[in-house]
């Protein structure tokens, strides 16, 4: 079954300006079998649980993608190049 992604187009454009990462590229980390996902309690609410997934994009960039589950789709909220600490954690766990 293929994963379905959705996002706000205005946020997607703003994300490219701010973080130099497109949501199209960000969506490719979910195909990385070595990616890891953690719950983000600080940015979650009773109405929406948020998660951060760290993984390698199709371009080989290690990205951190904030997202939530919308039933049949993954809604991407933001994406950026992973921090040094996040990259180290990703590399050590694989």
Model-derived segments and spans:
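Ribonuclease/tRNase effector modules and their secretory precursors
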Residues: 1-94
